[in-house]
Design a protein with these regions (language model features):
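A glycine-/polar-enriched beta->alpha junction
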Residues: 30-40, 47-62, 90-108, 118-125, ...
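Amphipathic alpha-helical coiled-coil segments
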Residues: 41-56, 123, 127-147, 157, ...
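Periplasmic alpha-helical coiled-coil/stalk elements that build and connect Gram-negative outer-membrane
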Residues: 2-3, 126-241, 351, 355, ...
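Transmembrane beta-strands of outer-membrane beta-barrel pores
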Residues: 70-74, 97, 276-282, 308-312, ...
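Acidic, low-complexity, intrinsically disordered peripheral segments
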Residues: 403-488
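Outer-membrane beta-barrel translocator domains and adjoining extracellular loop/strand segments
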Residues: 76-82, 217-219, 267, 282-290, ...
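Gram-negative bacterial Sec-dependent N-terminal signal peptides
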Residues: 1-22
Length: 488
């Protein structure tokens, strides 16, 4: 409790929340979708881009303005004691009849908004992939720590039994030292596994904004693999749906449209103008003449404004050339995106197949390692195998179990990588993986592998009562037989 209180205080100050119950993959993603700042930022950029279309369209619509003026004039010298006031109001209307630059600007913004929409879709898929990867990395770290803890317990039992057998003269001190060495090695591995789990949990928190005391773990019994579609079918689908490729195509279209927009600098413009106005003049003062009579005047005007650029110092031609170079660059980027999409699809396809093969291989490796360990333990009990053989077999078994677990998680992540490469990754894919999950499991290292102070103390004190204890008879004979290095 003393360790938990500072954590809770830190979370409350940091603005992070802690889930009150175990969450599965789909629930974790749904929480991330609502709070992930990267996705929300991309959504805001997309909305701003679409809103800017309205701004780009506005110059093509009628422009209506209302003006009003008030002027007071006070004379001096010859016009002394003469003053006047003028009040006027006007209403102006301007309508573009032909201005290709404004139409091109609207088209450019529409294409820009389309690119931003694809960027948002990419952010959605990235969040799905990042959430699933972080989630499975936590489960993988839990499994690694669990197997490391199980390996530690197994080696501890060997160390304890070997120490007892040495104390009664059944084994040599080297057996105890070998067991102790393996135990110390697995303790170092446990420290690393605990740290990896803490970091994995923190990475998931960074994606979702939440800490999860427990998560739904992988249901190994229900887990199964499926081979992907033929790679040619995947490549064909990626050609039309890969988001990076789609964004590059839209960028090329945008660059092509920019050339057309630059060329409008040579084109004429034609605007319609219309206005109506009213003016009220009032005169006063002791010396106001008879000619300065009060009057109210009004006027209506309609006109056309035509403009044809003849020469602008070469600026328009330069802008066209710049746009053409930008189009070449966008075309090369499209080719690069195309190659990258092919490479990503093929790599993801290969990774899925490799994961499936690895799962099958490690399943058999676990079975073989377990059989080997059983045989080594039986051989050690009758003296045909050494403690080193038993310890090596134990390490091999738990390494195979860890590799099998890692292969399962890699398979699921690689499945999502294929979907992402195709541009079809969505929430339904997470639901499919979510069906592979089962019981809840704690994410704290102290829950996965509780520290046992008594066991640690026993292991530290697991030293032979006498380092000079008599070597067992069988070992003495072996020593005497090998005392002469040249003897045969």
């Amino acid at each position: 409790m003393n360790k938990l209180l500072p954590l809770l205080i830190g979370l409350s100050l940091g603005g992070f929340s802690v889930a009150s119950q175990a969450e599965n993959l789909l629930q974790v993603y749904q929480q991330a979708r609502l709070s992930n700042p990267d996705l929300r930022s991309s959504a805001a950029d997309r909305d701003a881009a679409f809103e800017k279309i309205n701004e780009s369209r506005s110059p093509l619509l009628p422009q209506l303005g209302l003006g009003a003026d008030y002027t007071y004039n006070s004379g001096y010298r010859d016009a002394r004691d003469t003053n006047s006031t003028t009040k006027s109001a006007s209403l102006q209307l301007t309508q573009t009849i032909f201005d290709m630059s404004k139409w091109r600007a609207l088209t450019l913004q529409e294409k820009t908004a389309g690119i931003q929409d694809v960027t948002y879709q990419t952010a959605q898929q990235t969040l799905i992939l990042n959430t699933a990867t972080a989630y499975f990395n936590v489960l993988n770290a839990i499994d690694t720590l669990s197997y490391t803890e199980a390996q530690k317990q197994s080696i501890y039992r060997e160390l304890d039994q070997t120490t007892q057998r040495f104390n009664v003269g059944l084994v040599a001190i080297t057996d105890v030292q070998n067991a102790r060495s393996q135990y110390d090695s697995v303790l170092a591995s446990e420290v690393s596994a605990r740290n990896d789990l803490d970091n994995a949990v923190e990475t998931l928190r960074q994606v979702t904004g939440n800490y999860y005391p427990s998560l739904a773990s992988l249901n190994v019994d229900a887990f199964k693999t499926e081979k992907p579609q033929p790679v040619n079918a995947l490549l064909k689908e990626a050609e039309s749906r890969n988001l990076s490729l789609l964004s590059a195509r839209l960028s090329q279209d945008l660059a092509r449209e920019q050339i057309r927009s630059s060329e409008t600098g040579h084109m004429p413009t034609l605007d319609l103008t219309a206005s109506t106005g009213l003016s009220n003049n009032r005169y006063g003062g002791d010396r106001a003449s008879a000619n300065n009579t009060d009057n109210i005047t009004g006027s209506n005007q309609v006109g056309l404004s035509f403009n044809l650029p003849l020469y602008s110092g070469g600026a328009v031609s330069s802008q066209v050339k710049q746009a053409q170079y930008a189009f070449v660059a966008a075309s090369e980027q499209l080719e690069s995106a195309h190659r990258s999409a092919i490479q990503t699809v093929r790599s993801s396809f290969n990774n899925v197949n490799a994961s499936i093969s690895s799962i099958n291989a490690y399943k058999q490796a676990v079975i073989s390692a377990q059989s080997s360990l059983d045989a080594m333990e039986a051989g050690y009990s009758v003296g045909t195998r050494t403690i080193v053989d038993v310890l090596d077999a134990t390490t091999t078994l738990y390494n195979a179990k860890q590799q099998l677990a890692n292969a399962r998680y890699s398979y699921m992540i690689n499945q999502l990588n294929i979907k992402s490469a195709l541009g079809t990754l969505n929430e339904q894919d997470l639901q499919t993986l979510n069906n592979h999950l089962g019981k809840d499991i704690g994410t704290s290292p102290d829950i996965v592998a509780p520290e046992n102070a008594q066991q640690a103390a026993n292991a530290d004190s697991a030293e032979p009562r006498s380092a000079s204890k008599t070597t067992p008879v069988s070992n003495k004979s072996a020593t005497r037989a090998n005392s002469n290095p040249f003897g045969q």
